[in-house]
Structure formats: structure tokens, C-alpha cells
Curated annotation (Swiss-Prot):
Entry cofactors: [4Fe-4S] cluster
EC number: 2.8.1.8
Organism: Toxoplasma gondii
Sequence positions that bind [4Fe-4S] cluster 2: 278, 282, 285
Protein name per the record: Lipoyl synthase, apicoplast
Note describing how the cofactor binds: Binds 2 [4Fe-4S] clusters per subunit. One cluster is coordinated with 3 cysteines and an exchangeable S-adenosyl-L-methionine.
Plastid is among the record's keywords: yes
Taxonomic placement: Eukaryota, Sar, Alveolata, Apicomplexa, Conoidasida
Binding annotation for [4Fe-4S] cluster 1: 252, 257, 263, 493
NCBIfam families xrefs: lipA (TIGR00510), PRK05481.1 (NF004019), PRK12928.1 (NF009544)
Gene of this entry: lipA
Amino acid sequence: MAYFFDFPTDTWVEDASPGGPPKRAFGHGLAAGSSHFASPVSRRRLPTITALLLFSLLSASQSGALSVSQCSRRVSLGPLLSRVSSVSCTPSAAASALASSLYPTDSLSSVEGSVAPRPPPSSLAFVLRRVPPAAYSSSLSPSVLRFKHSLPRPLQGSLVCAPGILGGAAGSARFAGCCGSQGRSCGSGKNPELPLKGSKDEVIPRVGTSTAGPRPDWFHVPAPQAASRGAEESRYQQLQKQIRGLDLHTVCEEAKCPNIGECWNGGTATLILLGDTCTRGCRFCAIKTSSKPPPPDPLEPEKVADAVAKWDIDYVVMTSVDRDDMPDGGAGHFARTVQLVKKAKPSMLIECLVSDFQGMEESVRTLAQSGLDVYAHNIETVRRLTPYVRDKRAKYDQSLRVLHLAKQFNPSLFTKSSIMLGLGETSEEVVRTLRDLRDHDVDVVTLGQYLRPTKQQLGVVEYVTPETFKKYQDIAEEMGFKYVASGPLVRSSYKAGEYYMKHLIDDARKHGRRETVKQVKLEADVGTLKGTTTTFQVNEKEA
């Protein structure tokens, strides 16, 4: 295969694998030390180890080409390069180094290309500076900045830029923007912003780099409450103990949510179904990932129903990791859990915060008609930032379509989505995203501040003020959303029970009805996973 990397120089390696003619795949958009490849033939991820190897080879020389003496030295960048301990300057050794770090199981028999004559073996330029075919040139956007800022901060300071690495006028311009005209370490000082499409105001978030400064005072939250005097355990402690005993997972704990004490003591919990390992790698999320996670617990629906029936809560949010490895994305597992919870506690209000199920209509239908009360799917960010923030399989328009399908399959459902702010979006983009959600019949929207869970996730670009959140809330309400929750500490499931019930009560008041919900009815066939949606009945206001 011919791989095109978004590195400081156009790079491609031809893999003449046995069993077929050479194939080509290309990719761009380096993030978190890995490049995403996209083509009809191949969709693969470049490991961090290879990114560091290639960049260290380029950084070893001011000219971007390695001499024999430079090639013979050992490459030592810590455990990330443990699989490639030395590099030789001969073509065969270079091919072996690339192959072993890229895909150890692949057969990389040649790195010779058909575009230019083979350079002399005294340089590795034939690997690192190969010019791709003209047909693919427009797909490449080399950038020292984008690569450097995708690395952990300690490694950024050890990478040295040189004008010769990029070559040409465009390369010199990028070099000057990163390191200055004389050349210096990129690790010193503040990292420059990355403007997109010529706009100085449009920036993208970067892994390991936060430009927002210290957290403002409005992010201070109270610690979880202990038991009150005379009581054995607080509501928070009771939930925590029961969750541990049933071997269940909550997003409140996994994501280190700052609102856990307020939500749990307020009677709202968010459970994670389908395990704790995700098949996707969104750059804002700290949940562990794997292409082949363990199978879900077949008894999990029963465990959840048993737990919820015992808890002193009136609203439960059930979310999950993405399970692209399952034929239905886990929709059937979700639906059965909803049915069993409703059977065990009919008064329970259930919100399901789910993935896009890869856009599979039947999966959306299965869950939408399972008996849940709120169908939630988060669009997460604005259209421009989606490729930088979410996994490559998560598409902006696909998320909108899934929310619209859920409403079509069950018009009585409340649909809900959430937007994270502080990732470099503009106010116009936020308003456009709100409009897109409303145009697809989304009923409820929440807006909250993005907070980086660990240093391995995207940095915070800015802390949005409470006044700005209030402005977005007013705009969203004018658009016709049935309920809007907007604030720095608001999360998709933050105090969801209170928000949801408040919306119902306010809606009843507007229509001249009683201030309380009188009855919740459920008719569902648990065995077939089919049933009518929960309907709320309220009495007319007495004359």
C-alpha cells in the first residue's frame, strides 16, 4: 500500500504485499499522535510510535535527510519507541523499521516507488521525502504545527524544526510560523494558534495544550454530601454502595464528572451499559478504547432493573460506550434493559443517551419503540470541529439524521442533544448548530463547558462565561426548544430528572392544566421488546 502521512514532509511508502497488486490509501488530519486513513480500500490508524519515529528521523538533520553516521545511532524516545530500538540507513533496514512499527503482521517487501528514481542508499530521503502522484497531491496538507501540538508537551520541546524539512515556499512559511526564521525548538513559549481556511478567529483544539488558563471561580462545586446527623448513609453513599455491589458502571464516576454529588443526592444517576470499553476514540473522552472489547454482560439488563427498583431515584439516565463490533450497535441490549426497568418500576422516567448506531435505521427504531421517555444523542460540537473532536466514524449529519429518525419512529418521544463549548467554536457556529438541531425536531438541548478529563485529551481553548451561556439559552428558547439547560457545569445528564419534570410542569401550566403529573401508564411486551411509549396524562384544570 502507499500511505500518505500528514507529517512535516509528504511521505509515502509502497507496500508490495503478496496476493495482489499494490494498493494505495491516504489520510490527513493528524491528532493525538495518530493519523486517520480513509479510502475505499483501507481504513487504518497510524500508531504514535511511527509518528515519533518518522519525526525524530527528520529532526535529526537540518536538511531533513539523514547521513550514514546519523542513521547508525540509536533512537531513544522512551517506551513509545520500545519496538524500534535502532535505525539503519540502508533501504532494506528502513523498510523493516517502518514495517515493524506500522503493522507488525503486514508483509512490507518494498519501499521503492514508481514516481521518482531510487535515491542513493546514503540517505533516508527516499522514504521521508518521496513526492506522491499528482492525483493525490491535493489530499495532503503537511504541517509541523499540527504534528507537534498532537504530541505530549514534554516531547514538544525536544523536536527541532529546520527550513529544509518542509521545502518550497509553503514549507518555509510554515517553518517560519512555527519556529521563526532562524530555527529553534518548538517547545519553548506558547503554542501558536492554528487558523483554518484563512480565518484568524477559527481555531481548533489540540491534545495536550490548553490555552484557556486557570479555571474560573464559577467551576467550584461542593463535595458529595456525607450522611446527615442521625442517618446511617446519605443518598450518595447508598447509590455508590449498591452500584459497587452489582458490578455496574456509571458515567458519573468513569468520566470524573464534577456534578456527581449534586446529581446523586438529587435522585439522578447515569449508568453505562454494554461494558466500559468503547470501540471509538473521540478526543475529548477518557473512557478506554479497543477495537474488540469484551462481550456485554448478558445479565446486565436484569441487574440494572433490580438496582433501579431499589434505588431512591425517580429518573435514570442510561448511556453506553459505542459498540460498533455488535451487529445492531447494542440497540437490542438497550431495549431489553428499558423494558425490564419499566416492568420493575413503572413510575421511573428513563432517558437513553446512545451512540449513532452507525446510522442503522432498524437499531434506532428498536430503541425508539422500546418504552423509553427521552431519546438522547449528543452532537457534541459544531460542524467545523467535528473531525477534530469526535471519532472519524461520528459524522455531524449522521447525528442529526439519527435524532430525526427517532422522532419519526415515535413522535411522542422527547429527543435531546448536547453541545460542548470551549473548544474553539464561534458564536455563529453555535447558533447554526442549535438551528440544525431544531430543524431536525430535537426537543431538548443542553450546553455546557468542555473540561479536559486528563492531559491526554483535547485542551480547553476558552472558558465560556455564564453570561454567554445565558445568551445561548435565550436564543435556543426563541427557536422553539421545549427545554434548554445552558451553563458552565451543565452536562447532558446533569440534574436531568429535575429539568425533565420542570419542563413537563411548565408545559402543563402553559396549557391550563394541573401543576403535577397525575399518572404514568406503560403498556409494553417485555418478551418481544416491543411496546408503546410511556404517555403522560394530566387532568384539565378545574373551572
